Regions:
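Conserved loop-to-helix interface motifs that mediate assembly, gating, or partner/ligand docking
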Residues: 1-166
């Protein structure tokens, strides 16, 4: 009976953290949408060739960023994201494109480590309270890989896919 009460309390705490995180995401959605619109407009009407605004004709390597939780008690949150990420990696490989896994959250990291899968980048320990600095660190790493020439640089990627839940 005591274990049941503790488990229920932990579930309530997890639920409140998820609600807080979702509230922060919803608050930033208008900004993100406007930024996406502005970048799309620049990319569409610009004649400048830049790796961030041009699509690779023959992609050879893709980055798959899988965003999971650091801890349990979130139901199928992490397992759903990891499963979807696995399917995306398989799809890319079936099309002859090498897929590099970039992982956020201990759940995804532990899943990949347990199965001895390659990890190109990993971040954890901040899913309860993510900050701009955390997002910037991840973005800088992925942008660096995207800008690098995948033809000549093993860390370079031609595509970037992000797997997350809403």
């Amino acid at each position: 009976k005591a274990t049941k009460k503790i488990t229920k309390a932990m579930e309530l705490i997890s639920a409140s953290r998820i609600v807080k995180a979702q509230t922060r995401v919803q608050a930033s959605t208008p900004y993100a949408n406007e930024l996406t619109r502005a970048v799309s407009a620049v990319a569409s009407y610009s004649s400048t060739k830049h790796p961030l605004t041009t699509e690779s004709e023959k992609p050879i390597r893709a980055a798959v960023l899988i965003i999971s939780a650091d801890r349990g008690m979130a139901g199928a949150y992490s397992s759903s994201v990891i499963k979807e990420g696995d399917q995306l990696v398989s799809l890319r490989r079936n099309r002859g494109i090498e897929a590099n896994a970039y992982l956020v959250g201990r759940k995804a990291i532990n899943y990949y480590r347990f199965r001895n899968r390659a990890i190109s980048g990993q971040w954890s320990g901040f899913s309860d309270n993510p900050t701009y600095e955390h997002a910037k660190e991840i973005a800088d790493s992925l942008i660096g890989a995207f800008i690098a020439d995948a033809q000549t640089d093993k860390s370079g990627v031609d595509e970037l896919h992000i797997v997350y839940t809403e």
